[in-house]
Amino acid sequence: MAQFLSKPFGMTPNGEKINEYIISNPGGLAVSVLNYGCIIKNIWVPTKSGPVDVVLGHDTYADYVKDFESSGSTCCGAFVGRYANRIENAVFNVGGKTYQLEANNGKNHLHGTFPRKLYEVKTFGDTLLLEAESPDGEDGFPGNLKISVRYILTEDNALRMDYRVSSDADTIINLTNHTYFNLDGGGDVLGQKLRIYASRYLEGNNETCPTGNILPLSLIHISE
């Protein structure tokens, strides 16, 4: 059975409380999550020499706000949406209608406002549940959304992320978590290797907007 701890992390200009929630299991895995952006602030994994934090995070709420509101935001640790990645020219079509979005990355739309939302938090079993809503027209997207994010610690010391969204209108959605990992807990990552089991990839243009072309993967593409 997981254990839960909460503590203050900051306050918005409107007086809303930012809290840090730490969920840990008997196997020694612990995860720190904020109700601001569903941010994963820390992941401590058990090692022979003690717990090691294997993700990057900021020390204060103000640091996260400064990051997320900058033109070069890293979205460090955040739950990203309504649409992760870039939408070219900040425009798309769905249900026979054209929607113009906020152009927040040059002429394109990038990620959306989910990283800057406040979420209601519930805990049960091995699960931290965060819930919020996104009104119709937010960032230009159609549909009122109900959002739930679950962070679950499993018995084999894994962190599972479960996203669920419902909409009352035709819309598009593409969700991800924007955590940065350093498996050594510090220093650079140049000696670390990542293996991706894939045979194809989604092509991007010179502004890294998806072209819609799904191409075969090769070692040349990986090195690029």
Q: Model regions: which residues?
A:
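A conserved active-site cap/scaffold subdomain adjacent to cofactor or substrate pockets
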Residues: 187-219
